[in-house]
A protein has these predicted regions:
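Extracellularly exposed regions in secreted/surface proteins, prominently low-complexity, repeat-rich
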Residues: 151-159, 163-212
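Lectin-like carbohydrate-binding module/patch detector with strong preference for beta-trefoil
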Residues: 98-111, 184-193
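Bacterial N-terminal signal peptides that target proteins for export
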Residues: 1-8
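A low-complexity, Ser/Thr/Gly/Pro-enriched, surface-exposed linker/loop concept
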Residues: 33-72, 102-157, 198-212
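C-terminal motif of bacterial Sec signal peptides marking the signal peptidase cleavage site
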Residues: 17-20
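Extracellular glycan-recognition/adhesion modules and their associated mucin-like linkers
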Residues: 37, 75-87, 160-175
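Bacterial signal peptide processing site
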Residues: 22-24
Length: 212
């Protein structure tokens, strides 16, 4: 009899313990519930972001389009805006279309080592071409034709250009803005919270807190 009572007590205790475990257990959070902290930019990048906030907003007139039979027409794109740093180190062209791949930049006469051409025989390689893809902003890309204008309007130093015609898919504006500074060009894509700094001396992609 005593043995049976001990066994029954042990069974009840085990059941209560399991019930308590079930009551206290916390379900594993779903991926949507996990809070990912904003990236902490380096002091240099924070300085660039501060400059962008304080820069004067400017409006640049589209570069004149050219006749399709003009030999230089490849360098002047209709429905686009082209701008550069006053020193001519960085050129950018923004096309009037709300999709990735409609904004490109290029470094002229780079003083740093540009990426070498990967083994791809059927495309034209532009080592100084800057664009955004799945991996963020990169320099060195295969493009079918020049994607940045040969000539462009100078964007004055300490001035930013808000590309409000390049909107995110949900319609917010602006998606892109670029600032011209004596140390180079800074461009931010607010949809991806990724940006880059480019000059003759460097190309630096970075992430930044979405709330500037």
């Amino acid at each position: 009899m005593r043995t049976q009572l001990i066994a029954a007590a042990a069974l009840l205790a085990g059941t209560a313990l399991l019930a308590g475990c079930r009551h206290d257990a916390v379900a594993a959070p779903s991926p949507d519930d996990v809070s990912v902290p904003n990236p902490d930019p380096s002091p240099q990048i924070r300085g660039w972001l501060t400059q962008m906030r304080g820069a004067t907003t400017n409006s640049i007139v589209d570069y004149p389009t050219c006749d399709k039979d003009d030999a230089n027409c490849l360098w002047y794109f209709p429905n686009s805006t082209s701008f550069r740093t006053p020193a001519g180190a960085v050129f950018c062209t923004a096309f009037d279309a709300p999709a990735h791949g409609t904004f490109n930049c290029a470094v002229r006469n780079a003083q740093f080592t540009l990426p070498t051409r990967p083994p791809e025989p059927h495309s034209q390689w532009h080592a100084s071409d800057i664009r955004q893809g799945d991996q963020g902003w990169t320099i060195g890309n295969f493009v079918g034709q020049p994607s940045v204008a040969l000539e462009a309007n100078p964007l004055p130093y300490d001035t930013k250009l808000v590309l409000s015609h390049l909107k995110s898919p949900s319609g917010e504006a602006p998606r892109l803005e670029c600032g011209s500074f004596t140390h180079g060009m800074v461009c931010l894509d607010h949809m991806s919270a990724k940006g880059f700094h480019a000059s003759r001396d460097d190309f630096t992609p970075f992430s930044y807190p979405s709330a500037l």
